[in-house]
Amino acid sequence: MNVRSLTRGLCSAAAATTLTIACATIAFAETITVTDIAGRVVEVEKNPSKVVIGEGRMIYSIALLDQNNPFERVVGWKNDMIRFDPDAYRKYEAAFPQAADIPSFGSPYSDEWNLEAVIALGTEVVLMNLGNLLKAQESGIIEKLEE
């Protein structure tokens, strides 16, 4: 995986509905082609195993799709759920103890986000909120990923 492929995915990701998809495609992985809400076409890994979520509340949607263990694929996140919905977080943590061990990268829309750590984890998909596309552009995260 390299920064360029992660960038390609992030640019596409910043524009899908509630969850936006970005990915770094591994050459040998089976991929699918998707079109995001902005009309961008991107290839993503068909069954990603390493996902970073830009906001903790995205775990609610992931839980709908992966009811057995919504945290199984999450390798990093913005752990704001702990602050904004502590009751739900405690329930998730009780059911899925590994939630407590997931590293937080802070906000992907600010300087606190650690791009190097995201890449070092072998991240295949980054999910971001469409409402923060402008913030992602203004923070320079898309440009940083393009370098």
Where do the PLM segments sit?
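A short helix-to-beta-strand connector/capping loop
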Residues: 30, 99-101, 147
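Extracellular/periplasmic catalytic domains that process cell-envelope and extracellular macromolecules
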Residues: 43-47, 68-69, 119-121, 146
